Structure formats: C-alpha cells, structure tokens
Swiss-Prot record:
PANTHER family in UniProt: NUCLEAR PORE COMPLEX PROTEIN NUP98-NUP96, NUCLEOPORIN
Keywords from the UniProt entry: Autocatalytic cleavage, Hydrolase, Membrane, mRNA transport, Nuclear pore complex, Nucleus, Protein transport, Repeat, RNA-binding, Translocation, Transport
Organism: Chaetomium thermophilum (strain DSM 1495 / CBS 144.50 / IMI 039719)
Family annotation (SUPFAM superfamilies): C-terminal autoproteolytic domain of nucleoporin nup98 (SSF82215)
Presence of the UniProt keyword RNA-binding in the record: yes
Biased composition (Acidic residues): 999-1013
Gene: NUP145
Record-given protein name: Nucleoporin NUP145
Amino acid sequence: MSFGFGSGGFGQNNNSSTFGGFGSTPTTNTGFGSTGTTAFGSTSNTTGGGLFGGGGGGFGSGNTFGSGFGSKPAFGTPATTSSTSLFGSTTTTAGGTGFGSGGFGSTNTSSPFGGGGTSLFGNKTTTGFGSGTSTFGSNTGGGLFGGGSTTTGFGATNNPGIGTNVGDPPGTAVVPFSPTVEKEVNNPSQSNSYQNILFMDAYKKWSAEELRLADYNQGRKTAAPGGTGAFGSSGFGGFGTTSNTGGFGSNTGGGLFGNTQQNTGGFGTTNTTGSAFGSGGGLFGNKPATGGLFGTSSSQPAQSGGLFGSGTASTFGSSNTGTTSTFGSNNNTGGGLFGSNNTSSKPAFSFGTSNTSTPGFGTATTGSGFGTGTTTNTGGGLFGNTAQNTNTGGGLFGNQQQSGSAFGSGTGFGQQNQSTGTSLFGNTQQKPGGLFGSTTTNTSGGLFGSTNTGTSTFGQTPATQNTGGGLFGSKPAGTGGLFGSTATNQPASTGGLFGNLNTNAQTQQPATGGLFGNLGQNNQAKPSLFGTSTTTGGGLFGNTNAQQQTGSLFGTSTAQQQPQTGLGASLFGSSQQQQQQPQTFSTSITDISAYGATTLFSGLPDDKIQNPGPLATPLSGKAKVKSRSILPMYKLSPANASRLVTTPQKRAYGFSFSAYGSPTSPSSSASSTPGAFGQSILSSSINRGLNKSISASNLRRSLNVEDSILQPGAFSANSSMRLLGGPGSHKKLVINKDMRTDLFSPPNKDKQPQEDGTAARKTVTKRVSFDTSNVETPEKTIESSIPATDDSGYLKPDARSTANGTNGANGAKSSPVAAASPPEMEQVKGKELAVVHEEESPAPAQTDKPRGSQIEPGAYWMSPTADDIRAMNRMQRQRVVGFTVGRENVGSVQFKVPVDLSNINLDDLFGTIVILEPRSATVYPNAAKKPPMGKGLNVPALISLEHSWPRGGPTIKGRRLERHIERLKSIPDTTFESYDPETGVWAFSVEHFTTYGLGDDDDYDDDDYETEPESAVKSTPRPVTSPSISKSSTSPIDPDDTFEFRRSRRALPGAFDDAALSDTDEVANHAQRQGTLSPEPQDADTPLPSREWPEDESMADGLDEYQLEAYEEASQQGSVDEQEDFLPSRFAADNDAPQVPAGIMRARMRAVKKLNAPTKIEVAGGDDWTQILQASVKAPRTMDRATLRALNESGAVWEMKDRGSPPPQATATVSDGMGFATSIDLMKSLFEQAKAPTQPALTTSGKGFVKWPYEQRSKTDTEENLAVPRTNWGPNELLISTQHNEPNLLPVDAADDSATSPSTLARLQQYINLVSSKKQLQRVAGPEFRELAQGDSVWELAALLFDDNGEGVSQFWQQLVSEATDRALSFTAGLEEKAIICLAGNRVDEACRHLLAAGNFRLATLVSTIGKVDNKDIRAQLKDWRESNVLAEFSEPIRAIYELLAGNASVCAGVKNVPIENRVNSFTISQRFGLDWMRSFGLRLWYTSGVIPDVAAAVRSFQEDIEQDREPEPDSALWTLLKAFASREYDWSDTRLGWLLTKAIYTTGKVSFGEDALQKLDKASVTFASALTAASHWVPATFVLLQLSDPASREAAVRDHLGRHAHRIGSPRNLMSPFFTLQKFGVPEAWIWEAKALDYRSRQDSQQEFLALIWAQNYAEANRTFVTRVGPDLVIERNLPRLFAFAQLLFKVKKHLPNWERSAAVYLLYPMAVMQNQGSGKLDRFDNQLIDGLVALHSQTHGDIRQEAAIADMAEELIKCKGAAAASDPRLLQLLPQDVRGKYLRAQVLEAF
C-alpha cells in the first residue's frame, strides 16, 4: 500500500500488495529506501531503511550511493551507521548534528528528544520531562511520544492498522454474498469476478478479522445461516496480533502525553488502550481506552483530562459528551487543542474535518483547510474523516465532493466519493484519494502523473487503465498511495522520469510500494533512474520483504522466517522479529454462508461434522509410538475402514476451510511450499494429477490414501467401500498398476530440488518404505552413513542438514524453530508408511564394498593440456604425439600414434567423445559421429583401467585370480598388455574404438565362486559382506520345512558333505531377493552377500574344491535334456533297477529343492512391483510328491534347470513309493533297498506367465551337455556311458555287467554292419541308435565343411533338427510360438500357415520373405516402435518374429526407464522358447547370415553370443567342427605350422617328400625364418636357419642373417644379450664376431673392428684394416704403445698373412726403431727392413692421404732418430713431402760446403 504519491514515490515497481495499512511485507523497491539504486537510496544488502532512517536512503544514509537526502556531509551521517532514523539512531558510531544525538544522521544510541546522549532537547540520563530514558516519559523504548519495548521513533508497532472512524464491522449477515464483477478496461467483453466477501461494498471497509470478530460477538460461530466468515486467525492485513513494538504505541511504558495501558497502535487501532496522546496517566490526560496519535476507533468514555484535552472540556476546545485527545478522539465529548466538536472528536491537525464545530485550522461549515464542503461529520482523524458529506469546492490537491481530509476521507485513507473538479496534480473524476494519490480513472495528467482509480492514501485495489502520463511516469492501473498500492495485473503504458516500469505485474501481485515500505511479493526486476533494482526494495519506514506474513506499520514482522529487510532500520524503528502464531484457520468451520447468501453453495450438501479435529498442527514434537504394521490400521481392519475413511463428503468447493492450507491438509502436504497457495483451488492445483485409484473427492478425506500402495477399501467387502475404489470382495484383490507410478519408478539421481519458490512445482515423487526400527534416533541432522539392514526394504533417508531449508515437513521450507526438531522420518516411530522427502532421492542401501570400489571417479585430464593444444598452430594440432586422456580413479587412454585434434572441440572431449567410467572406456559413444579407423581418435591406443579386480577385490588369489586374468585376455578386439593384482590396473591395446571394459557380469561363471581352502573350522556364519559363496556353506534342506535352516545339520552316512552347487542365482543381488527397489544398478560392482546356513563341524571335512569342481562338471555334463532324451529307463530295461545309493543324495535333493521350494523370483532393476507380486502369486508351488519322485528318477527335472519358462509337457502319473524327496525318504535310501520307478514318462510343469530374467550360467552347464550323456570307449572296445545323470560310479553286480550285456553288444554289431555296408543310418531310428547316429552326423558334417567348402550345410542342419522341431511343436500351444518353432527348423511355409491361422496376415507375408530380402526396413521399424513405446502392445512371440525378420536371433531388447505400462522386458529367443543350441544356431545360419547362408558368419555370430553369455557353450563335436571351419582362413605369411609339421613328419621316416625332399625342407626353413625375421624374431630365425641341410648354405645364410642383425647381438659380457643365446644355438663364435666387426665398421670404429676381426679369425681382413686405417691413425696420434700392441697381434698370425713384410710389419718395426735406437747414428738390419717396407707400403697407398701422411711422418721421425745416415738415404727422402725434402737437401749442401 502507498501512503501517497499515487504510484509510491520515485522508482516504484508497483508490485506491492497485501491488505492493511502499515503491516504489509513488501519485497519491491520504493522511492524512499529501495534495495535498488533509486533516487533516494543505494543498493544496500541487508539493512534497508526508509526515508528518515536506515541504510537505504533518506536523511542519514550510510550507503554507498549518496542520495539527495542521504549524503554524509549534508547531515553528518558517518559511513559506518547501519540505520539512522529521523528521530533516533540505533547505532553506536559517533557524529552529531544540530539536533543532538538524534535528528538527521546521529548515530548515538539515544533518542532525539530525550535519549541517552547529549542532544538539543535532552541527554541520556536526565530527560526533559522526567521520564526514565526518554524525553516524553518512555520507560523502555526510545520513542518520541512514548516508548515501546523497542527503540523505535514513535512507540510500539503491534501491527496496528491505519483505520479511522469507519464504524464497527456489522458482520457478514447484513448483506448476502455475491461475487464482485468488474469489467476489463482494455477488453470490455472480459470481466473479473472476485470470489471474496471483502470486495463487496458493504464489507470492503473492514478486514476479514474484524468481520469474523463481529460474527463471533453476534453468536455466529458455527455453520448456522447467520454464521460468520471462515477465515480463522491469520496475519492478513495490518490488524494481527504480532508482538512487534514500534511507531505510536508502547508495550510497557507511558509517554509524555499518556500512559499506554494495552499496546495501542500508532494510527488508530482496535485495542482498548490509549496511545501516546490519548492514554491515562500521562501529563496530558489519561485515557485507558483511547486511540492513537491520529484518532482511534475506541468508543469508551474518557477517564480524565490531560494537558491538551480533558474528560469534560478540553483546554483548547470544548465538547459536549466527553473529551477529545490532542489529536482527535472517537469520543463524543470535549474538543482538543485545535478544535472543538460537539458530536465527536477531531484530530489535532484538521486537514480534512468537516465537523460542525470550528477547529483550529478549519471552519465548521466549509470543510477542511484544503477544501470546502458541507459538514455533517462529527470529526475525523489527522489523515481521514469518517463523514460522508458532499464537498462542493475544490481543494489545493483536488476537488472533493464529500468532505475529504488532507489524506483522504471516508475510510480513513482514501475518499470514495465522486469528484468533479480538477487539481494541481491531475483530474480526479471519482473518489479523491488522500494527499498524494487519487483513486479514480484519470483522464488528464497531473504534475506527478496521472492517478487512477481508487488509490487511497494507504492503497486501494482497483484495476483501471491510465491514459495520461506524468512527470514521474504513468501507472496504468491502481497506482498506490503513500503506503503502497495493490493494483492487479495491469501493464504500464508510459515511462516516467525515474524509469520505465512497463513490465507486466504478475497476477495477484502488488503493484506499488509505499512510503513505509514496499508491500509487494516476488517482484520482477525493473529499471529505475539510477539502476536496476536487483533486489526487493525498502520503504521509507523500512523494508519488510517477508514472503508470507504482513508486517507492522513501522517494521517487519514475519512468521517463523528470518527478517529479509533490504535496508535495515526504518524511520520508526525495526521490528523485533518476534514469531507470530501459526496460521490456522480456526473459525467458521462449517459455515457455508460466510461469503454471502447460501445460493452460492446451494448445490452442495451440508458439511457439518461432529468432530472436525484439531485446528492447529504442531510443527515439532515427536509422534506417538504406534504398533507397527505393514499397512495402516484402517486398511487392515475392513470393519473400521468406513468409520475412519468415509468422513461426511459435504464440503464447499470440495475442501474444508478448517484444514485447507494447514500442514496436515492434502494440498499443503503435496506442496513444497506450505502456505504459498501452491495447491490452491484457484491456481496451481492442476500441477498435481489425480491418480485413477483415488476418487475425485480425495481432498475431502481426513486420511491420505497416497500413503499406501493399496486403496483404502482394498480389503473391505462393504459395499460402501466401492465408492472409495475398493474391489468389494475379500477374495479379489485388485491392484491398480496406474496408481502412483512415481512410487515404483527408479529414483532419479540427477534430480535437483527447486530453489525458486515461485517456480512451478513438479509432480511430487514420494517414495514409501517400511520403517523397521523401534529405536528412537537422536535429534540431530547428520549425514546418513549407516548401512541399511540386509533383510528389510527400509530405505533410510538422508538426514542431512537443511542448508537451503528444504527439509521441513513434506519438503517445506524449515523454520529456525522447526530445524531443532528431529527430521520427519525420525519422528515416525510406528510401522506406518514412512514418507521420504519429496525433493530427495532415498539413500542407497550401504554395503561393505571391496577395497577400491568405494573410490568415486575423479576429474578428467589430458596430456598435453588443453591450453598447450590451443597454443599449437594447425599443423601441430594435426599431429599431436603422445596424446593421453585420463580420469582420476578410473584410468587413461594413451594413443599410440600421433592424433589429429584440428577438428575436435576440446571442450567436448571429456565425457562426450571420451567417456571413462569405472572399468570401462569409450571413445566416440555415438557411432554416427565416429570417424573411420585411423582418423581422429579412432586410432590404436593403450587403455589402462584401474580397479579391475575380480568381484572379491584385491584379496582374491589363486585360481580365481588366474581365471580373472584369462578372462581379461579373452576380451575380443583387445590385446592384453598387463594386469597388476595389487593395484588392479588392467592395460590392454586396441586397434580401433568402441566401448571396452570389464562388465560386472563378465567376471566369473558360477564355477568361479570358489573359496580358498580354509585352515580352521568356523562355528559361526560368515558375514554377509564376503564376496564369494563358500562351496561347503549351503546345506540342502527340506523345502517343506520353513525353519529347517535353524537346526544344526549333521553329515549323513555315505552322503556327500554339504557343499551346494554354486549357481548364479545363489549370489543374486540381495536387493532383488527382497523385492525392493534399489537405487543402485543391479550390476554394481559390490560384493554379493551370501546366504549361508550355519556351519558346524560336520561341514568342515568335505571334498576338496578341485574334486568338487570335477564332480559338478561331471554332474552337469551327464544330465539329460527334455528334447533329446536318448537314454530313458528303457536303456536299462534288460537289467534290474539299479540300487539308489546314498552318494547321489545331493543331486536329487537339489532337484527337488528346485521344484518344491518357494520360488525365488528375480525382477531386473527398475521393473515395477507388480511383477514381483504376480510372480510370487503365480509362480509354481509344491507339486505332488509322486510326480516329484517320478521326475527325479527319470532325470526330467534337469530339463527345467536354470530355465526361464520351461515348455509344457504331459503330466506323468507314477505310483508313490519309489525314490526320495524328503529326509524320511533319504533315510530309507540309506538303510533300505529302494527301487526306482519303471519307465516313467517325461513330464514338466506347465509354463507360467512369469519370465525369469536371464542369469549367468557356467559354460559347462549347457543344453548340449544335458542332452547328450558323456560316452567314451573303454577297455576291450566296450562303450562306457553314465546313466541317469549320475557322475559317480554305480554299484554293479559282478554277475551281471551291464556294459557287456548282450543287448548292448548286439546294437553295436548292428551299427558296425550298417556302416561297413555303407548304408545311410536314419536319424529317426529308435532311441538305441540315436547316440550312434550322432557320430555318423559328425563325419557327414566334416565332409560337407571341408570337402564341399560348406555347401549343403543348410539342408543338412535342417534335417538334423527336424526331429527336435516336431517334438517341440507337439508341446507348443500358441500359434505364434509354433511359428517360431517352425522357423527354428527352417520350415518357413509351415510358420506362415500358423500365422495365417492366427489371423496375422501381414506378419505371415513378411515371414514368407525372411532371410531372402534386406532387413534394414524391419530394423528401422523396430527402432521406431521402441522409441515410441509401442513394443508393450506386442506379445513376446510377435516381438521375436520381428527380431528374426530384422536379422537378430539373439536377444530381444526391452524398454526401460519409461512408465510402467510401457516397460518391456528383454529376453533371449533361445531360452524363451526352449531352443537347444542346434536350433539356435540354425536361426543364425538361415536368417542372419544373408540371402545365401554363410556358415562361417553364423558360427562367428553364435560364438560372440557365447562369449557374452547369451548362449551356452555347446559341448559337441559338431560345434568343434563348425568352429574349425569358421577359423580356417589361412595366413599365408604364417609358415610356422607348416615348418613344424614338415620337420616332424619327415623325421619319422615314414613319409617322403620325393627326391628333392631336402630342398623342400630347406625352402620351408628359409621361408619360416624370413617370416620370423619380418616379425622381429631374428634370434629364433637364426635357429631355423641352422636347420638347413647344406652346410655351405647354412653357413652363408646364418652369417648373412647375423650380419644384418649385428647391432642387436650385444656385448659378450652381458649374459642376457643374444650373444649367449646364439652360442647356445650352436652358432660358431667366429660368425658372431664377424658380424660384430661389420657393426663396428658401420660405426667407423676401426680399432674395435680390427679386434673383432682378429677374434673372428679373419686375419687377412684384419691385416687390411690395420694397414689402411688403424696403423696410420695410431702413427698420426703418436700412440706408439698401442700401435706396437696391435702389430704384435698380427705378428702372431703372420703365417696367415702372405704380405706381412710389406704391410703390417712396418707398423711393428717403426715403434721399435723409434723407442730403442734413438741417436745411434747408423742404420741396422731392421732399419733397412723398415725403410724397404715403407717404400713398399707407399706404393700401395693409391692416393690415400691418411696412409701417405703416416708414411711421411714415419720417414721423418726415422731421419730424426738416425741422423745423417738416414738423411742421406734417398729412399727416405723420396717418402717425405716436397718442402720437407727440400729442407734436408739444402742442409746437406750447406754441410758439404
């Protein structure tokens, strides 16, 4: 609301509203103290103030922006003040003005007129009028006219209203309610209907609280026709009961002019006590029940007179009835200081009175000082007149037809009468407003802008269009007054001086801010003259931008929220921020006529109830501990359901006012912001959809049906419960799958809570779980790190601290008081449903993880860094060497070759192009954007993945570790580099990129779950955190005995020890067992808790793990398949039934357990709860014991082992009494001779609708193994076979050996005769020949593959699976399933006939072309169906047929992460329809390998599925042949096998390769050695060359080979060098040194070359090297000792040197002549020999400058040593250079003369 100036000052947002004068809580800017940079205040953050105080503007601002009225030099305000009010300061910084410590800018703690400091009018200790701390007698506060409990300017601020003498509220029974309709100005055809009684003319003068109080006083407290309104007690408006103190009313003390007995407000409240100038006990008169400064609405008689008014007559004016206070009173007595009144008192400043008496500043008949008018009014306040008289004259600020006060008349702060005149500030045709604002539609602009309809001083709420523009901007509709306006939803049309405010206000948003604060909420940022107001503005008297409660007149008073004032202290003081009472609408619960006539609600029945329940909901406190149950009590007790649920459904508009908006109402609990009307019936209730299972009147119920999965009437047979959605029968439980889908959808981890309170709320995603703890948790908010219990579905929510306040009740913002209470989940102590907070995901169930898996992935990194790469030029970026991308705690990708980064955005590299996840690395996840191989990053690379431990973590050792490493080595398309068991780093190389890694399901098969031999016997169960399942920990139990596992089990005589076969379902995820929704993916790398039975001593002494493994393998391979059971009991028909030994107990008990135990259903992660419920209901249960025994004995139980949906078969009827299935039968088998049943028929149970998910199985446990028993030839050509799937040796009667029975031998002889006569063995022969026929099939397939290159395999395979196809068709019922069985047997025509019979003509047409046309269109169609969520409408057989049409014979992919009704499960075609491996391979052979069947492609496709555990590994000779054929592509460069076989065959002497056999062998050796050399294996190649038969060729080849690799031979001193390997191969050492000499020569190391040649015994080459290079170099270097030493080496072998005397001997004689015969003066024999050698050597230099220089040097040295004898020798002189020779000749001539 605005006090004046129409639009609320300068730079107003016009978005403020809330009813009430001075108690609103605006959040927008005002002209006087906004948080934006407006004209009079800068952008202070937290200490907003008003015009005369505070940090935001006005007079005495300490802000950063000096406004015109708030600069520091102007009024002496220091910069450190936080709020400075006009009449008092609240800070401690010094700095006084002319008015003492108060005034305009003082920052002392004293008040201006009697504060603590030395001021103009008083000091701190001695006040002017004797009061304790204030000049005017205030005891506690620093108010000017009477202190309150707060140090404000004018007293208390108990949210007083600004109302004047408007009379008492009449109640709501006077005028019937009718909606107020107003037409839009811009669109006359559109009307606005206000469904609020306060908009009616008869009630608009009063607030809802006043009307309600009047109804209460008149006795209307219930739903009677004359009842009162239904608003309850709230803080709506400025008349609440807040405890703030401020302005003009004191809480405790008496002021100068009167004592305030009971918290009077500043501007006229409805309290019973007086204010500063009208209360009793003061200097100027005591009035116990008078009003405030500007007039009150009290009607009590005055008690005594004061200085300016007495009880009988006033000093300055008389009155007939009573006294008037100084500034006006409601009493009809005496006059006040400035005027007299006979009928009622007038205010002190009669600016608008029109009484008959003559006030001080006005006449009795002509109106107020600023306007004339006829007067019949009895008096008015300072700011308003209560009369409704006609005003005929024009005032200074506008024409007023009826007596308007200075600030408006009529209602206290706004005139509502017609006006015809114009004013200085604009024309006001209707209802002149107050001093600064008009309330009518303006047709012309005034000085300060046009003022529109109905804007009173304190704000009106009309919605009209402004047409004119003013100096400060035109406001289109409902500009506010001084205290703010509440114009609704009108756009601004013009811009003013201080900013264009043409931004549309939000609906029901305040439009303006007032002088005393902006009263808006959630304003938008709008520009002003001095800047954009980025935060909400403060008013002149303080900003109160709280979001819910309205504030007081001079301060902020919020309810349970922190004060959010923008500019600190206000002019009249800041509020104490005391907590208000909670908003509870506690009145008029059943009154439907609160808003008018009952016709409005006539169509609704009466909603009166006997016990409405509590009207207030406590915000804190612990809930009462209740007895725990899975469902609420009213759901468990159908008899009480109607009493608890079916409350009277009689509500106006479908909801109850008593509960609406409270925390317990459905609308509040579903909203994230209670009290913000987020779920109101008028606005945003559409944000939350109503589910089908909840009736349309769910808002009327007192119990919330959303707390449970089931409907309230699910278990009730009462017919009335059908209205609530109940099934109406105890026997029929209807589960609505569409109810609350968010309860069962997987949690969204990426979901972030909404921070913006005004943003649209999404659908609430509550989750339910069962609280299993009766222990009260401590009241503290901590991070939940307690692991969830293993056997409960309880998901403990995060009790994290409410940093942003979103952990309140039901997701509401938590208040400071509520924050101390325990979290909501911890308050619930019963077994009722616990609601997890809406904005949070439930914490995952914590389990102990192996070391390393707890490390979270870190940040990405690259080398070189991104900055270094960006600094490169384009050419450099095209070849970045050593580029590596990594991620902390995950791994790295190092590219082996230079990569081209010129076309790669480095910002998209991390997480988009290169994705590094734990145990996985992906480059180019989008295949469409992947460049060709060798381009971009799709190049060879080295990948290192951390934490690649086995499932058990780094502690796994032994065979499991070895298998893990083998698994790593077998990853396709990768080259294993290394694996570090300690760190878990797995390094491997790839040639191109896709997704590489180790999935959690890729670690082990079930035979990997072994434990190391335990050294000690444990008597207690191992903890569930163990990652492995003990082989000897699971004891077979009787499935009928539920508590069998609690008993101590002992080993039975003759039986195996309790070591259960570890299947994958035993180590399934624990969360799947419980049926709960785990927030983590089901394949997370977490240890799988084992379900172990208690161990005792009898379990410790069992089989060793290797024996156990062998036993399991034999057990699985000896099992029987249901479709190829070639060994029924007829096989042993000639013999007596074998005895049932105790040793086979374990296998049989496991079979019975498989069928008889409660079925363990696993649903993949993310599936809905209904599948678990349906699976548990429809899953197979206990069977007839006779049937179980029959199946067990016949071996048919193995048909259903690890099957998802076993095919139906005929039911067997076998007499009870044979075999065993319980412990009783087991005992009989141990001590009695039990017989097996004779020839039982093969039976299986019928298929149920529940499909088991695919589970990992051992490669040895396959259908082929189950189908064919292991048969082998024994001694004496006897056929040995295991019988009845038993791996152990059967007890055999010595007198009757079944292996040598005549029948068996007769069948063998018959088969031999057939084969020898070359007759075709029919595969459809009797069972006794089937296993023999398989051997014949192997030979036939081998001939087709290797003789005919695979031609004819298709027809052969169709004939091979023909019998299995016929048998499966007889067991299949559905036509679509029969079509798939036919397709598996390549019977396309028959499949089309089945589809035509089913009426699916289009699909039959497509099937007729299967395998013959391109299937890309079908693949595209399937993709579209999957993306559009249509696959849910298809049955699984239809989906499988379409997948086959698309060329996919493996897995039908499902659809996840969609609503439940659109989810589709994945399944493997072969497992879903019970296909064996041969028919599954046939699907790939006929339909996926192309138009012409490609056997090799089909084999590779099937092998890939086997490696990915989609298909079992066949144990068949047929599959071995197929793999050999598919991998027969020969690499002609690889001659290893040919060389080895050739050598091996030739050395036997039994095979000859012809006359040139040796040449052929040598050629193979040379070829193989060349291949090895090309592969850098030159050392093994040397060994191959040594195998050459011809010695000369062998020597030449080896020496040549060594010469080419001489640089790799190494030093003989290094034992690890190839030097010693070559010696071990038998390579002569001379050949090795010769090769090394070549290496030294290439490096120009002549001395080492010389030595190597010496050791290679190549003396001639050594001599040549020494004479040409080594000797001359040593002579020139003057290294005579080494020269002599090297020459001695040749001297020792001079017999091998024919030219010794003329070559190397020179270098031996020269050092001897120089060192031994110096200065002798004569030449001896050796000297002459040396000279001859030099002459001979000189003739061989051939111009070599090195040799010539050495020879000249030796000749000159010899002349120097021998003197004249040598100098006179012409042989030496001719060896010298010409200049040197001339020197010696001249010397001889001179000596001669």
